[in-house]
Every structure is written in C-alpha cells, then in structure tokens.
Amino acid sequence: MVASSYVRSRLFIFPSCLSAICLGIAPVQAMTFDLGNPDFRLDWDTTVKYTGGVRLHERDHRLADSPNRDEGDYRVDRGDMIMNRADVLTQIDLTYQQIHGVRLSAAGWYDFGFDRNVEQNPELRSQGWQSSYENDRYSGLVQRYYKGPSGEILDAFAFGSMEVGDTPVNLRFGQHTVYWGTSVYDHYSNSIAYGQSPLDARKSAMVPGSTAQEVFLPVPQFSLQSQVTPELSLAGVYQLDWKPTRFSEGGTYFAGTDYLFAGPDRRPLSPGVSIPRLDPLEPDHKYGSFGLSASWTPEFLDGELAAYYRRFDDPMPWLAPQSVKGGYRLVYPEDIDLFGLSLNRSLGDASLGVELSMRHDAPLNALGVSIADNEGPRGDTLHMLVNMIGALPKTSLYSSGTWTAELSYSRLLDVTAHEELYRGEDDGCAPLGLDADDGCSTRDFVGATLQVTPQWLQVLPGVNLALPTNVRYGIHGNGATSASGQEDTYTLSIGLQADIHERVTTALTYVTTYAPYSRVTNGVATSGRDGFSTRDRDWIAFSIQTSF
C-alpha cells in the first residue's frame, strides 16, 4: 500500500501552483534506516528552504490612502524585503512489509526580518485612525505564523491493508489529506475537491514552491479505498474534526483588507472609533463531513470515470463579515451537498482531465450575513473544468519541457436563501447601484490557467535550468461563489530555476497580480473587481532549498 495522503496521481503537477508561481522541486533524497528486521523500514525525508522576497512596485495611493487597506501597503516600501524566511519540512514513514505503517510530518519556520510593529499611512494616523491591531503590534497568531520561530504537526496517521472476503481494503486513520477529482489549479473554487481540505493560503503566498503537503492542511479523518473488481473501486472518507482555511492576515503584505481574518483585533470605522473582532461562528459539530466515490476503469475507456458525493461544512467563511452587537465576526457555512463526475485519461501524448459538479445550498458571494439566522446567501451552482498536461514540442530552443492548461466554468442555477444578501449584479448589488465592475457576481464565469515550463538540461555538469511561466486569467464574468474568479483579473509569474546535482534547487521568480478598480472617491479607490486592493504588490522572490 502506498502511504501517500493524496489519492490522485495528477496531483504532482500543482504543489507550487497553489501560489501561482509553479516552481519545480528537486527529488527528495530520503534517508533509510536499517532496523535489523527486513520486514520493517524507516524513511526520513527533510527539506530545508530559504526564501527572500523584495517589493518591486511603488504604492498606489488610491489604495494606500484607504483606512481599511493601508496597513498591508505600508508594510514595506519599494525595494525593501517582504520576507527573510527559513522553512523546514520533515517526514518520517515507518512501514511493515510495505503494507502497514505510520507517517508523521511536521513543518517549522522563522522569519529573521519580520517587524512586530504595524505600519499605517502616516496621514491617516495623524487624523486619528487606529490600526487593526491593539497597541499597533501584530497579534500572537500573526507573530506565530509570520515571525516564528514556530512549527506544527502536519500528517499524523496510520495506514494499512486488509481483506474483506477476497476484496482488498486500504485504510488510513488519523490526520491526513484526501483530495478527489482531476483539478490542477482550480482546486479551491470550481473543483470537486472544493472544501475537502482547508488550505494554508498564508504559506502558499509567502513561500514560493510550497508543496501540497505544506499547503493542504490535513484534518483528523478516517478514509478507505477498496478495489472491488479489476475495473471498479470504491472510496469513502469521514472527517473527525473541522479546521478553517488560513488566509493572509490583515495588515500583512499579501492581505487586501486590514481587519480580516483571524489575526486582527478590530475594525476601524472612523477616526478614533473601532469595533472588536469577535470569535468566528464555526460549525456546531466539528465532525461529520463525509464523502463517497466510485471509480470505473474499463479497458475500452483507456482511463478512469469516477462519481462522487460529498456533504461537508465549508472551511472558507462568507468573506463579508457579520455585524453583531459588540463587534464583527466571520461565519462558516454548514451542510453543503456536492455531486460530481470526473474523467481522467490519455489523449494522444497528453493527459486529459474533466470534471462536472453541482453544489446544493452552496455559499454564495455575500454582502453580509443575517443576524436573524446567522446565514448568508446560498444557492445551487454548476461547475466544470477541463485540463490537459503534456510535453512541449521538440525544438532547438530548449531540451525538453511541459505545458499545462486548465479551463474553468461556473454557473449560478438558483439562489435558494437570502437573495437580498447575495452580491449579484441583479440581486443585492442592484439597490446599491453596483455592478460587475464592482465585483458583483454574474450568472456565468469562465477562467483559464496556462503554465509553460521549458527546460535546458546539463547547461553545466549536473545543472539543469527551467523557466516556469504561469498566467491565470478571468475571461468572462464574476463567479457566484466566494473566491471563484473575476473577469479581467490575472496573476502572472515568471521564474528561473536551477536544479543542481538533484540536491539543491534555486529559483528567482517575479510575481504580479492585477484587478481593476471601478470607483475612485476623493482620490481613494472604493470599489473594483476582487483583488484590486493588492494590485500594487509586485514582488520578486529568491529561494534555495535542499533535501536529505
């Protein structure tokens, strides 16, 4: 039995693409220990990485002059370091006859240059505007995850295999990750795997090349997979706990809104006046999310056709906080149903993945959350994606290379609850005079991601070079669900990577994001497509890592 905490072979493509940087990772050089018994094996893998980042873009004062967006923008000046960070990831596998075993992995980090003091626009401070943090110092949560030194346990699970009659059943119990479907990039918005695991978006933004093991946060759960016949396999998962997705915290460099999410202490409303952030409203029972899947691999198909059903509590909140007596808080939706189909097969020399899914009572893009029932807008939505992975055509310009393309589509079928709170251009936005240019959702959304990575082998003895280039673009419309993509927004990254003797990987990567703003009042941008408040945060990252 393979001890991997992932269940789709195509997953190898996107660990680094979580942050749209898409750097490759050198093969891990594992240490294997002789335990004196051939039935037992102990493998220990450790990766150490350094990342330095520098801001390249001047502040756009139409953004930095906003009292709710200035702290992230004033975090560093152009030419200053965003981070000066060391990370370590270590993993131990103890197996018995390569069938049963346990896995334990952990991550640690420290940023040598992180300043605990919150920066504000000096003009706003002089007017009496408070920062989003008490005493103008980052909270303990922010200091733990951004400064350190700190760490956490990731995987901690046991695995094994047994036979029920003549049918083999593979089991895993403990803290691990399960990921279904064929998505490569659009895993957190339009895929079958949406909400199946919380994500560490903080780390994916801060650390280029973060692996899936670091970014997909494992949760305590029980999962199984059984090969019922040579052509049919069944799988199931039951979660024993719930964890929220981690976002870039307000007031840090990659955050667009100062008073969100779990880090800030308060929300400034006017000079000298702020309201406190309250504890989030999380699911009543942090257990019970489950899923079932069946995979069929008939010979004539030359691939895999799979069906899925999941019922889950969302690790992502409605992104508009709820205003309640005494403060504001985030609210996490419960009881979402997802039905899906996927196809994974070869098509010529390329690999093809297709997904079609429908969500019932899915949380929608919100203007707010009702205080009557602690619910935001919900609806039924349709999602589809198609992706292909292949090798670049042979040419004298490079030695080899790969390309990956993914097209995503979503459609709002119906608003089933709190239509007045739905941030749709014909719904809650209409009375406010807002439209799609202000980030209001449309019925349909189309987006695409393309990555091209040419490689040059043995440019020096033992040295291979690669030039990963990745662009993600919103082609049409604004998605109806949270963070599902918006028209005319993009993320572009261009990197130069060197793999040295398959032991050391270095990379230099430029990253830029763009979203248009639509309204400027008194010199301050007040509205636009989602992501407009970080459009002036271009940066360049240098990283070096080794594994042993």
Task: Label each residue range with its predicted role.
Residues T46, A86-L94, L104, D155-G160, ...:
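Residues on the lipid-exposed face of transmembrane beta-strands in outer-membrane beta-barrel proteins
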Residues A30-W44, H57-R59, D93-V102, D115, ...:
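Short loop/turn motifs that connect adjacent beta-strands in outer-membrane beta-barrel proteins
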Residues F40, D70-G72, D80-V88, P149-L154, ...:
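Residues that define the transmembrane beta-barrel architecture of outer-membrane proteins
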Residues L42-Y50, H100-A106, V169-F173, S233-G236, ...:
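Transmembrane beta-strands of outer-membrane beta-barrel proteins
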Residues M206-L392, Y409, A430-G439, G474-I475, ...:
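Signature for the C-terminal beta-barrel architecture of outer-membrane proteins
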Residues Y50-L56, G108-F112, Q175-Y179, Y238-P244, ...:
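Transmembrane beta-strands of outer-membrane beta-barrel pores
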Residues Q98-D258, H476, G485-Y490, V511-A515:
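Outer membrane beta-barrel
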Residues R503, F532-F548:
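Outer-membrane beta-barrel "beta-signal"
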